[in-house]
């Protein structure tokens, strides 16, 4: 049988282990509990610390309990993207470890080949873990962060901050500096003084008495023959973002895959500009839409594609895909690069409906709010370089599409009409197409049809 002393020592050890567990639990609860529970935890922690230091006090046996489910962290993962996207680059975290985040509040932004994806927190709580750094590559399903569910900390509660160490008051600091300076002065006085060297008295003549110096040309300092200052030659290296990298890959892929060829034509914009001038104010008043050129050109392309369906088709393996719908990809320039949001079923929309959709998508693109759905698909692309002053150019096919139409600037040029030289607002059109699917005759016919519809917009009513 164990002796009484041995049993007593074992009991004390057991009590200490229970207190230690309670103290650790109290420390954990203080970081995450409500105000009332925080006070209770603080009391347990202080009492337990006293007991563990050797003083005899009574400690309640576990006055509160912590369950793993109550404080279990929520894992936040990289969300699913489009079928063609499986990874991206972490652009930034909006929170740091220890910060409180509300439910549905933005936690991180992921940059993909097409758009930026925002990741929101599914719960309210404290951020306990961030697994990546900006510019790290993240894949779908990977854990981005962990959030421990909980309420927002009340004002005045939370971990007690360590009291600042006492600092000497300014007056004390000044006195200390004065004392140190006095000690230094006394030390200097105690040191033997060196005999001062006799100073030579120098009498400077007055300005009026000073003789004027005459400098001959031979005595003048020589001027540097080469006073050229080199121009700065600095270089700055900036890492390409994922969108720019993807654009570069796709454009090169298009050049390597398609048998690209470009055909040109010019269109007289007089009738379209006159119609726009007549109805512009009325359209803005009724619909709030600015009547531009893109809606009419898009509609003209959908009508011309009915006669030349290969323009709207695609090559997939050893098959040609023909479509009875036309999804127009509209090229929009953004600070991060060129994007091509899609106007769905443009063949079924009116000119104003197309114009409205283009304006909506353009605003979303410039604000960085495009979704993957806005960017997916597209059967034919229109690029309007004329808004930037382009006169002439050859666009690149937006693979896997078959053709792209490039619009250029409207310029007044002399043209011959009925034997007379007149000035007309003219625009160059450029159609780049994949010669594997589209023959030259079909490409020229398509572009000629677009030209005729734009030069006489009333013909669109006949289709």
Swiss-Prot record:
InterPro entries attached to this UniProt entry: 2-oxoA_DH_lipoyl-BS, 2-oxoacid_dehydrogenase, 2-oxoacid_DH_actylTfrase, Biotin_lipoyl, CAT-like_dom_sf, Single_hybrid_motif, SucB
Segments of skewed composition (Low complexity): 148-157
EC number: 2.3.1.61
Any one GO CC term of the record: oxoglutarate dehydrogenase complex
Segments of this protein annotated with the region 4 X 6 AA approximate tandem repeats of A-[SP]-K-K-E-[AV]: 185-209
GO biological process: 2-oxoglutarate metabolic process; cellular respiration; L-lysine catabolic process to acetyl-CoA via saccharopine; tricarboxylic acid cycle
Active site, UniProt feature: 435, 439
Disordered: annotated span: 144-237
Reactions it catalyzes: N(6)-[(R)-dihydrolipoyl]-L-lysyl-[protein] + succinyl-CoA = N(6)-[(R)-S(8)-succinyldihydrolipoyl]-L-lysyl-[protein] + CoA
Cofactor: (R)-lipoate
N6-lipoyllysine modification, residue list: 114
Compartments it resides in: Mitochondrion
Induction: Transcriptionally regulated by glucose and activated by the HAP2 and HAP3 proteins.
UniProt repeat feature Sequence, residue ranges: 185-190, 191-196, 197-202, 204-209
UniProt keyword annotations, A-Z: Acyltransferase, Lipoyl, Mitochondrion, Phosphoprotein, Repeat, Transferase, Transit peptide, Tricarboxylic acid cycle
Basic and acidic residues: compositionally biased ranges: 184-212
Additional comment: Present with 7970 molecules/cell in log phase SD medium.
Subunit structure: Component of the 2-oxoglutarate dehydrogenase complex (OGDC), also called alpha-ketoglutarate dehydrogenase (KGDH) complex. The copmplex is composed of the catalytic subunits OGDH (2-oxoglutarate dehydrogenase KGD1; also called E1 subunit), DLST (dihydrolipoamide succinyltransferase KGD2; also called E2 subunit) and DLD (dihydrolipoamide dehydrogenase LPD1; also called E3 subunit), and the assembly factor KGD4.
Function noted in UniProt: The 2-oxoglutarate dehydrogenase complex catalyzes the overall conversion of 2-oxoglutarate to succinyl-CoA and CO(2). It contains multiple copies of three enzymatic components: 2-oxoglutarate dehydrogenase (E1), dihydrolipoamide succinyltransferase (E2) and lipoamide dehydrogenase (E3).
Listed name of the protein: Dihydrolipoyllysine-residue succinyltransferase component of 2-oxoglutarate dehydrogenase complex, mitochondrial
Species this protein is from: Saccharomyces cerevisiae (strain ATCC 204508 / S288c) (Baker's yeast)
Organismal lineage: Eukaryota, Fungi, Dikarya, Ascomycota, Saccharomycotina
């Amino acid at each position: 049988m164990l002796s009484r002393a041995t049993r007593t020592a074992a009991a004390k050890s057991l009590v200490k282990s229970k207190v230690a567990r309670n103290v650790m639990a109290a420390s954990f609860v203080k970081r995450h509990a409500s105000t009332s529970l925080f006070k209770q935890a603080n009391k347990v922690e202080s009492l337990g610390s006293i007991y563990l230091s050797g003083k005899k006090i009574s400690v309640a046996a576990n006055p509160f309990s912590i369950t793993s489910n109550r404080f279990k962290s929520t894992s936040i993962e990289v969300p699913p993207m489009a079928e063609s996207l499986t990874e991206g680059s972490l652009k930034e975290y909006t929170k740091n470890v220890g910060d409180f985040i509300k439910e549905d509040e933005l936690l991180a932004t992921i940059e993909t080949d097409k758009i930026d994806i925002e990741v929101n927190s599914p719960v309210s709580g404290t951020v306990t873990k961030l697994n990546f750094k900006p510019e790290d590559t993240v894949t779908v399903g990977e854990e981005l962060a962990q959030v421990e569910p909980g309420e927002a900390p009340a004002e005045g509660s939370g971990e007690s901050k360590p009291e600042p160490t006492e600092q000497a008051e300014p007056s004390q600091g000044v006195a200390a500096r004065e004392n140190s300076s006095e000690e230094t002065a006394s030390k200097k006085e105690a040191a033997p003084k060196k005999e001062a060297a006799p100073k030579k008295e120098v009498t400077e003549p007055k300005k009026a008495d000073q003789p004027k110096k005459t400098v001959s040309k031979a005595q003048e300092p020589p001027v540097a023959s080469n006073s050229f200052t080199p121009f700065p030659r600095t270089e700055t290296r900036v890492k390409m973002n994922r969108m720019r990298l993807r654009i570069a890959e796709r454009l090169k892929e298009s050049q390597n895959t398609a048998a690209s060829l470009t055909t040109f034509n010019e269109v007289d914009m007089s009738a379209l500009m006159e119609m726009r001038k007549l109805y512009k104010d009325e359209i803005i008043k009724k619909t709030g839409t600015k009547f531009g050129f893109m809606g009419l050109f898009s509609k003209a392309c959908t009508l011309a594609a009915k006669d030349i369906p290969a323009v709207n088709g695609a090559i997939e393996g050893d098959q040609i895909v023909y479509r009875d719908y036309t999804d127009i990809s509209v090229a929009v320039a953004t600070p991060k690069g060129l994007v091509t949001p899609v106007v769905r079923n443009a063949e079924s929309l009116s000119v104003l409906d197309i114009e409205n959709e283009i304006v909506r998508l353009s605003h979303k693109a410039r604000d960085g709010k495009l979704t993957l759905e806005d960017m997916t698909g597209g059967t034919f692309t229109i690029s309007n370089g004329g808004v930037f002053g382009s006169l002439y150019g050859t666009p690149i096919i937006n693979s896997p599409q078959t053709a792209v139409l490039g619009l250029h600037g409207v310029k007044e040029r002399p043209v011959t009409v009925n034997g007379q030289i007149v000035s007309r607002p003219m625009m160059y059109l450029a159609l780049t197409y994949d010669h594997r699917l589209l023959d030259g005759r079909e490409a020229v016919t398509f572009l000629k049809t677009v030209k005729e519809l734009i030069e006489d917009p009333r013909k669109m009513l006949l289709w």
